[in-house]
Amino acid sequence: IDEVSPHQPVHVVAHDWGSIQSWESVTEPAMQGRIASFTSCSGPCLDHMGHWFRDRLRRPTWRGLKEVALQSVKSWYIYLFQLPVVPNLIWRLGMGAAWPTLLRLLEGIEVKARDGQASDGSHGVQLYRANMMPRLFFPRLRKAHAPVQLLVPTRDLYVSPALTQDLSRWVDQLTRIEFNAGHWMPLSHPSEMAGAVRRFVRQVERQGEAARGWGLG
């Protein structure tokens, strides 16, 4: 942010781990005023996710337990990535080369194979090991200091839409839009995603102009 916009707050758009990492900035008090808005797709705040699980297990209901069970099944790969050595070998010995085929079979998306896919996937495993369990078991209280838009693919194989249904306690200015799309929505529905981002950014900027006009900004 300091490099691309040192004097003006920025609009952040992120997906998957980019979104998970961006939540850190959007909920970090030291970053307040640097981020104008945040559009998140298929990448929840890990602290919010930890509280989501905790709340449903502490005050169990049939619906809540079903949501926990469904998300636990969707998160199968997270458990795999906690194992030593094995997931890294899977990426380097075959998963990297098979990635385009997997996306085509699971999501109907055509992507080209690229150099570095295997090493990127192997390094990505470290993100899960370093961040997932500490935040899920010991979640912090993290409130967003910027308007947040959630783009929710209802056919996401890894992130349940239910994970984003209780975020009003963490986000004061929240917009949530569901799409009939899979996890890789930026690849499968780029126009719809771009349109949602444009509309949200314009809305936030209009609200900012109105607040400044009233002497509130």
Predicted regions located by residue number:
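Catalytic active-site module of serine/aspartate enzymes centered on a nucleophile-bearing elbow/loop
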Residues: 172-217
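Flexible "cap/lid" subdomain of the alpha/beta-hydrolase fold that forms the substrate-access gate
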Residues: 1-13, 20-174
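Short active-site segment of divalent metal-dependent hydrolases/proteases
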Residues: 18-19, 186
